[in-house]
Amino acid sequence: MEKSEYLVILTTPSRNDGVRLQIERAVGTHGKHRDLRLKQLPHMETALQTLRDGTGDILAMSAFDWHGNDVDGLSIAGLLPRKEPTWVLVADDKPEYLEQGARVVCEHELLRRQMRRMRPDLVLETIEDVAARLKAKGTIADMDDEEIWPWMEEQRLEGNIDGFIVPRAVHAGHRMKGRRHTLGLQRDQTENNRERFIPPPLHGFTLLVTRQGFPKASIVEMLDPSAELAYRLETAILERLDPSLRPIVGAYVEQRKISTFLKKATQENDEALLTSLVDPNKKRGVFKSGPRIEMLIETLNPSGTVTAACERIVQPENSHLGMVNLLKEFMELLSVMTTDHEATKRNIIGMPASFMDASPRLMDLDE
């Protein structure tokens, strides 16, 4: 590409999704080797029209903006490396050490259930609950999305709440002084065997959107194929779920080195995981080379006392089939756990007599 040629990358002010900050850093990094010009527009609708008009070449947006706007005639050229999709607790103490009955604000139903699983004693409130309790409904009504969370941090500092749970990008974007405690994907055995928090799908992605026909090869050095694969698999999972399940299902897909899985399996003495990675045609201890795709999915009942979860590790070339099988297994498990079991006359050798008795369902998704 000649020096006179440049690419105009469109963006919008922060939308609490991390996109604005990431594209700015990406332009700063890759702009050292080619002419990239960042242009900020006031609204996503304006940015989309500017892209269609040909005034810009690329528009950076979140997965939620892509699915929530009219993108006819546009396509996804690729994705930047995925940012951490986990949510965080903004509080003085880790979730394990919050006082009994501490007040924590959380708007997302999945995170509320996951937090109840960990700390059933906490008082979980919504922003509306806090506003009503503090007689501040009028104050909240006049705020936009950029003002809500700084106000919530003020309430925490004043002792009106003990903490609040937000996407990591919200904490980073507002430069909050409060300590950030990651609600992580891995079970933390150092913190009273803390349960993992599988996040709501599609967080942390930055899509580079272009007009159809844009030469993707011209920006290939900016793109992360593993992030694109994870995005497409998480999107497929979300689209296949019943709409009633989407707000209460956590799903996460990531490509990782096989050494990462081996280290995890060794630390947790996970013989099943070790066995699944062994090449049966070679001596034990010699594993198939290459990365793996890890897929996790879970949902909980409202009180957080019962969890339905599945996970699968596959090679990249088998990722779509792996996703289909993961969902099939998850939905079958969910069906069994949410169905009352009728009494049966069938007697299975080795099973206790109570096996034939009627039994209630293991979980209700709406109690």
Language model region names:
Residues 89-104, 118, 122:
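Flexible hinge/capping segments at coil-to-helix
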Residues 65-70, 112, 171-172:
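Glycine-rich nucleotide phosphate-binding loop and flanking beta-alpha elements
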Residues 77-81, 95-96, 197-199:
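Short secondary-structure boundary/capping segments
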